[in-house]
Amino acid sequence: MNNEALAEDPPTPLWELVLEQFKDQLVLILLGSAAVSFVLALFEEGDDWTAFVDPVVILTILILNAVVGVTQESSAEKAIAALQEYSANEATVVRDGKTQRIKAEDLVPGDIIHIGVGDRVPADCRLLAIQSNSFRVDQAVLTGESESVSKDTRSIKDEQAVKQDQTNILFSGTSVVNGHATAIVVLTGASTAIGGIHESITSQISEPTPLKQKLNDFGDMLAKVITVICVLVWLINVEHFNDPAHGGWAKGAIYYLKIAVSLGVAAIPEGLAVVITTCLALGTRKMAAKNAVVRSLPSVETLGSCSVICSDKTGTLTTNQMSVEKLVYLNASGDDLEEIDVEGTTFAPEGKLSRNGKVLQNLAVTSSTVRQMAEVMALCNSATLAHDPKSGTFSCIGEPTEGALRVLVEKIGTDDMATNEKLFRLPASQRLHVSSAHYESRLPLLATYEFSRDRKSMSVLVTKDKAQRLLVKGAPESILERCSYVLLGPDGPRVPLTRVYSDLLAREVVEYGNRGLRVIALASVDDIADNPLLHNAQTTEEYAQLERNMTLIGLVGMLDPPRTEVADSVKKCRAAGIRVIVITGDNRNTAESICRQIGVFGEDEDLTGKSFTGREFDALSESEKLEAVKKASLFSRTEPSHKSKLVDLLQSLGHVVAMTGDGVNDAPALKKADIGVAMGTGTDVAKLAADMVLTDDNFATITVAVEEGRSIYSNTQQFIRYLISSNIGEVVSIFLTAALGMPEALIPVQLLWVNLVTDGLPATALSFNPPDHDVMRRAPRKRDEPLVGGWLLFRYLAIGTYVGAATVFGYIWWFVYNPEGPQISFWQLSHFHKCSAQFPEIGCEMFSNEMSRSASTVSLSILVVIEMLNAMNALSSSESLLAFPLWNNMMLVYAIILSMTLHFAILYIPFLQTLFSILPLNWTEWKAVLAISAPVVAIDELLKYAERRLYTLPAIAGEQQNGVAFKPKKA
């Protein structure tokens, strides 16, 4: 029976993905309009194929939009498949008294397995016996711990122990880095810890992004408004159904139904879906150039609206490369400590050593104490450094702590001046092991006494000039307890280790621990040759007997350092009103220290109620948890379930949550968050569950992405304002002509041309608007803030009403005021359907012949020119054209030129004149078009002035977050 394999769901069929693209209100409205237009075209008299232009164009747009949507679709299926990579392929199992290799998926609870260094754990297992002095597992992929974890067979009595504290359990998907052991399988398949992550990913229902939700709400509102207006227009004309001009009640009803459909086509921003997709796609290109690869288009905007970033610590805020920061030994007088600062935070074997700002060179030559420390670090070490010539980066093969010590040895150099001169001329890539090799050749290795959990140390036996020395490294509290002597000063005279010396060193260890540094003590035993246990030691107790009466040489303090640019990034997030919450599996002291260094906490800030461990958080009631997440900025010793819970709580408070991470353990929370941000060097599971991947693993890139996201949202509002005000203008135009009883000024094919081509090009160009100057000093938008707020709606209506009125007035002008026109009265124009009965002398054919087409051309040209001017207005929501001129966005300049060129094409190319039922304009008509269109700029400048005065509040009155005042921008 296949117990271990994780269940796989079948892939989503293509037809389902395509169908999903049509579950959008705007798309459904367009689909309905296309259907009605097609039916009306079938009943059109004559063989005029232009009747089918409307439905064909609409359907073409819908198909193109669906293709783009399916192409961009990213599902959890790939993430689930990637989880299989973290499942071991085979396992060594004891069955029927025989040891055999079987497929890991065939394991069942109760199987006894053997596992050793380099193996991937095939199932969740309970340790039975350890066949080596120590047994360590790298479980960062599951828990996020920056160091490998020592395991043992002792029982854990705490039933609520988190995974990090379950030291007798091996978790499926983690890797053994040291030792050999026997274990019994307890959980397989979906029941394992990694199986739980699989279950979390598959069970989650993807929530719509804030932008998608707002567009859906906007679509719902638009659907209702369009339906009401269309029905209203049809009903107010019921009395005209029997007018002689229509030739019967039924034909009159169909005629006004066509007008109602025209109204529907006019009201729907056909180009909106394509323009939004294009805008987001352009945003992804910009962000990719800045090392942020977006896997889901709507997430571009979503990141711009996030109010909380939940960040994993290890590998995200930190380098995930242990590095030594401090080198310490007692000074010559023994009343203080000599502290040497070490430069560099990666595994690159280069960096200066300094004391009080003064650079120190050839330390191993000038200081016997430092030389002895280098000897211990070089010999008590099984890690190796590696260099990738392609990326130019350095890495560690083995324990990260030992890798950090190896790097320090190379930074210190050898105890030979001539060797050092040659050594430091070499590039870092060629001196990965040069200094270490020097000490290894001087001190041949005789024996290794492996690390054990009980004595918290390891040692090596070396020889020099026929003398034998024991070099030891380990936890300071354990080493200090077993030391009898200590070296004083740089030249290292050995003196007894008194209580005063011991207390001085112990205080430094505590101080370093509070700062998040991991401290390693270095010691030696010089007169070891006479110890009878030297060649017979077999147990850790005997190893401990060897490691007695030691001489303490010094201490080293190391940490997984924060990335240098993270502090500035956190500062920018605060200025943007974004909370940064750190969620890590690491211990509290280390996490709090890192948080203080990067600015999440102040240097001396009281962390009461702001820092919780996973266990402390679990002990809270639901209401207390909700209160905790309002203030807390750090959660340490957490498990994957904590991350998902925190995302739920934050979202329930109305926050838009971004979650960063790089491990398998992060995947469920990455998927649940409004936007998941994975690291480029992270696991495939994390990357495939995320919406965005940071190729440079740089938390600071998120700040760039936030700014781009905010800019995209602002631009989205601008081109929606631009498109909708145009649509409102068209609706007002059709409604006014119908209400006034005038002939239709614009026909559906003209409206489609304006909506798709003439408007579409500038709308797309608005995506290139540069961000407003204060875009990163505004408070984040609230989750429930509508895309179209009250003020924005008023602006839509104000501009739209003018657009519609100007379009209708252009039609009226041609018939009533144009010196080259018929100059009939307005009453005659508004009663054209009674022309044959009441005033046939004017020539009723003018309402359907070339005169009508000329008037319609004036209306269409006014609409187009106003929209070009309106596009200029949309450069900024509140900044005047005088302060934010047109050439700030040259793409818009080109778009306006192209749109006008296309308009001239339909005006002056005969075939297109026929298609759009228009005629060329003369100079008199063009002057009228420009005069009627120009006031829209002045109107919008007044509205911008009002927004600056009334809706942009002074910063002191703005929202405050993390002690920073913000200037809110209102829609």
Swiss-Prot record:
Protein's job: Magnesium-dependent enzyme catalyzes the hydrolysis of ATP coupled with the translocation of calcium from the cytosol to the endoplasmic reticulum lumen. Its activity is coupled to the unfolded protein response (UPR) and Ca(2+) import into the endoplasmioc reticulum is important for redox homeostasis, virulence, cell wall biosynthesis, and resistance to antifungal compounds that inhibit Ca2+ signaling. With pmrA, promotes radial growth and conidiation.
Coiled coil start-end: none
Swiss-Prot/TrEMBL cofactor(s): Mg(2+)
Binding, Ca(2+) 1: V265, A266, I268, E270, N755, D759
Protein name: Endoplasmic reticulum calcium ATPase srcA
Family indicated by similarity: Belongs to the cation transport ATPase (P-type) (TC 3.A.3) family.
Disruption phenotype: Leads to severe polarity defect, hypersensitivity to ER stress, and attenuated virulence; when prmA is also deleted.
